[in-house]
From Swiss-Prot:
This is Large ribosomal subunit protein uL6m. It is found in: Mitochondrion. Keywords: Mitochondrion, Ribonucleoprotein, Ribosomal protein. The gene is RPL6. PANTHER family: 60S/50S RIBOSOMAL PROTEIN L6/L9, LARGE RIBOSOMAL SUBUNIT PROTEIN UL6M. GO terms for biological process: translation. Its main location: mitochondrion. Transmembrane segments: none annotated. Belongs to the universal ribosomal protein uL6 family. One of its GO terms (cellular component) is mitochondrial large ribosomal subunit. Pfam families: Ribosomal_L6 (PF00347). InterPro entries: Ribosomal_uL6-like, Ribosomal_uL6-like_a/b-dom_sf, Ribosomal_uL6_a/b-dom, Ribosomal_uL6_bac-type, Ribosomal_uL6_CS.
Amino acid sequence: MSHIGSKQIKIPKNVSIDLSMNKIYVRGDLGKLELPLNNINIHLKNIENDQFLILDPINTGTKKQKTASYIMWGTYRTLIENMLIGVSKGYSKTIELVGVGYKAQLIDKKLVLKIGFSIEINYEIPSDIKVDCSRSNIIVISGIDKQKVNQVAAEIRLLRKPEPYKGKGIRYLGEVIRLKEGKKK
């Protein structure tokens, strides 16, 4: 069994947490997030001017409910930790466009991509995500919700996945594409 759920989470100084019914609300300098909780108890603990969150699975109810609470214990801990980091520091993901004539522009709240198709592709950016195109072949996606930032990055990457022969396409910064060898005569 994994012990991720039993580790305590340190709360940063600039973050406030509200626990109500079956939800946790996290507020910080960059914004606020909420998460519905099922079959999990949360306790706040003070140790030497630092606040910690401790998660416990609910041990009452049917065997099925107990099992479900133990299964989700580590997941909830990680989600809450991601929320705390998101509202205090934020998350960002960088994408690069590799190919001749591949360009990206930000027009209003749309990302306009020229990626080798006969038409330009318009990608609608969600309201809580920030996109920066300071260079025409680099896209920086940032926000406070880790899941949304990575989801937007994955959706943009899927528009033109890197192909295995020349490596052209949209890829994450630092991603290594293993190239295949072409036909030999």
